[in-house]
């Protein structure tokens, strides 16, 4: 559980690092769209982890940077609460969650695997954001885990 909590600390730090970059440079539509996708996907997965219906929730959006800042704060608080609760109740991370994806297909996945996916999904898209920043002549944001833990 400690490793998962650390991965989410990294996720929050990395999201905040991207946000700070976006607040200080002119970014393209693609970068912002990828970032909102990360943040809305985090909300979708948390909703699924709580056993609630996520079928009407967006996973892509054209929101602005102000909305991103709010989503980062909400997601951080909500995941901290969720992780603290499953640690407190000693919930088995191998328990399966049944959910329906955005295409309407039903799946069963362990809590552990969903949490791992959320942490890795964001890192994948932050890499895409950094690639697009480079193309635009903007220095990328170092969101490497090792940089976070130093």
Residue ranges of each PLM-predicted region?
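Helix-adjacent hinge/juxtasegments
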Residues: 55-95
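Short, structured helix-loop boundary elements
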Residues: 1, 31-32, 65, 69, ...
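Active-site metal-coordination segments of metallo-dependent hydrolases
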Residues: 1-8
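Cysteine-centric segments in proteins
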Residues: 98-100
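Short, contiguous alpha-helical
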Residues: 8-61, 102-150
